Amino acid sequence: MKDITAMVVVQIATAGLNIFFKLAMEDGMNPSVLVAYRLLFATLFMIPICFIFQRKKRPEFTCRLMLLALLSGLLGVVIPSILTITGLALTSATFTSAAGVLTPLVTFIFAALLRMESVRLGSSVGLAKVFGTLFGVGGALVFIFYRGIEIRLWSTHVNLVNQPRDSSRDATTHHISILGALLVFGGNISISLWFLLQVKISKQFGGPYWNATLMNMMGGVVAMLVALCWEHDLDEWRLGWNIRLLTIAYAAILISGMVVAVNAWCIESRGPLFVSVFSPVGLVIVALVGSFLLDETLHLGSIIGTVIIVGALYIVLWAKNKEMKSMLTTSDHNETNKTSKDITVNNLPTLSTNVP
């Protein structure tokens, strides 16, 4: 139950990140500068936490470990952040979160191809994994493309983006370009690859805090170089007490700091599919927050898609829990057999006892 609660909190935090990113982009902030500052602040925030809570787990800083941290930073932060933020400016917060539910499908396909996730189509668990993942993606597609009647949950007259509302277009699909959609999907593929990478390398970093810190540090070096090549105007690098600074602080401390560490811990304990399947929860949260703060409109398709997504989530969780129980039962059975054999061997008479 602890890991499920952790992943729900992660999705709430990630949903808030999409809202902040949208506001920062509307304020004209350069995506590469945002990512560079985010990783710099995250590294400075996480270093003392590592020495306070995981001093004894500090890994040996070899060239191989730093290269793995660089690869993790590229796949987990730099590439998805730049692609998603750039795509977000061409789409919407709700679409970006909705596209994120493709992450479980991509993760499941890659994990199955690499034999990191068992898929037995002849068993109920295997079928539940496949159909649960597909239902989740199907629910997201319904959420995006089926409009239906308009549903007003509340009327706050709040619109933080400060853009005039166009009633002729649906809020979940307006300003969505093909380029923006491709950028967002590219970011999701990068996240899926990062999930799978974490399965192989997470234990080599000593602990989730060191994992997040080294990932942010090495990714930050690359992000800073990209930002310096992309943005030469010094005014774009100046920070004030505005939405840009708030977005950077939120992304650095809560997301790149704590959320990355929690994700690494859950991937190590429950696997990449378990983590990625919670992506649809973020879609529901963004839809509700978007309708409340960004004056986005919910429709019947949003409600139907949400129901399908939640149902799919429960199907996959059921499959994962049943699989975990089966693994624990098998492990206990093997341990019992081993102990029984040891006792039998120890009770056998030795050669010396038969000698008069």
UniProtKB/Swiss-Prot annotation:
Keywords: Membrane, Repeat, Transmembrane, Transmembrane helix. Residues 14-142, 191-317 form the EamA domain. It is a multi-pass membrane protein. It is found in: Membrane. Its main location: membrane. One of its GO terms (molecular function) is transmembrane transporter activity. SUPFAM superfamilies: Multidrug resistance efflux transporter EmrE. InterPro entries: EamA_dom, WAT1-related. The chain crosses the membrane at residues 4-24, 33-53, 65-85, 94-114, 125-145, 176-196, 210-230, 245-265, 273-293, 298-318. GO terms for cellular component: membrane. Belongs to the drug/metabolite transporter (DMT) superfamily. Plant drug/metabolite exporter (P-DME) (TC 2.A.7.4) family. This is WAT1-related protein At1g68170. It comes from Arabidopsis thaliana.
